[in-house]
Amino acid sequence: MATKAVLLPWLIPSPRHVSLFPVVQLPALETAGWCVRKRRAEDVAVSVAFNPSGNFDISAFENDQDSDKVEPPMPPTTGRYEVVIDNDSIGRLDLSPFQRAIGITSPDDFGVAEPKRYLDRTIGFTINYKREDPGDPRELSEYPDVRLWFVRLDAMYPWLPLLLDWRAGELARYAAMLVPHQMSLRMGVVFNPEALELFVMNKVFVVYPWLKRHGVPKPRLKTSDMARMLGFGIGDELFDLIDHNE
């Protein structure tokens, strides 16, 4: 039986969701080269379910005919920074395609760059990944080498989720590269809820101080919006604690 994850005191389910589980829309799989096979757009969603025995409980959702259908994704933001990677850059853990696309070479470069420019234009990814076996049905987030590239990217630029093209689903796809999950033909990506909670909290602790450090207006709101995109709400008590202990 699927159970709701135990949330931290400051981490509450987003009020926009009526389900017991946080649900996040993934964009159509054919968008931006993130997929290796197509599915119907209405079948693609991110849902959180977890079985205490240690297995993801996907079966609880497969036959739920009353579950909400996921709306088609919005198109990519016009003029966004587009990061194009392929097998070569992935295999060498080469981050230069990202650095060239957005015009920085190290995290320290943001000390002189204007974060608002990246927040306005946003960042997206196109993954040109050629499979050894054309019949391999796995999604890109299920390939270890692809995920490892994103793990390194996230380690170098931990505030990156804030700058992604949220409306086109880039944040949900990015999370799928870093958070344990399984694939469901009906539900799409099914996250481990505890891992998703930790991912969200980690990003809150990174993003909120980063926004304040760069003088970006309304850092609490922007941080909360990021968490809400993944199905969680952040209480002011947590921001107060961060501010008090800086």
Curated annotation (Swiss-Prot):
Q: Does the keyword Cell wall biogenesis/degradation apply?
A: no
Give the transit peptide, as a residue range.
1-59
List keywords of the entry alphabetically: Chaperone, Chloroplast, Plastid, Transit peptide
Signal peptide positions are none
What is a single Pfam family found in this protein's UniProt entry? Crr6
Q: What happens when the gene is disrupted?
A: Impaired chloroplastic NAD(P)H dehydrogenase (NDH) activity, probably due to a reduced stability of the NDH complex.
InterPro entries linked: CRR6
Transcription: present as a keyword of the record? Answer: no
GO CC annotation, single: chloroplast thylakoid membrane
GO biological process, alphabetically ordered: NAD(P)H dehydrogenase complex assembly
Where does this one sit in the cell? Plastid, Chloroplast stroma
This molecule's function is given as:
Required for both formation and activity of the chloroplast NAD(P)H dehydrogenase (NDH) complex of the photosynthetic electron transport chain. May function in assembly or stabilization of the NDH complex. Required for the accumulation of NDH subcomplex A, which is a core part of NDH. May be involved in post-translational steps during the biogenesis of subcomplex A.
Question: NCBIfam families, from UniProt?
Answer: CRR6_slr1097
**Protein name as it appears in the record:** Protein CHLORORESPIRATORY REDUCTION 6, chloroplastic
Q: Which organism is it from?
A: Arabidopsis thaliana
Gene behind the chain: CRR6
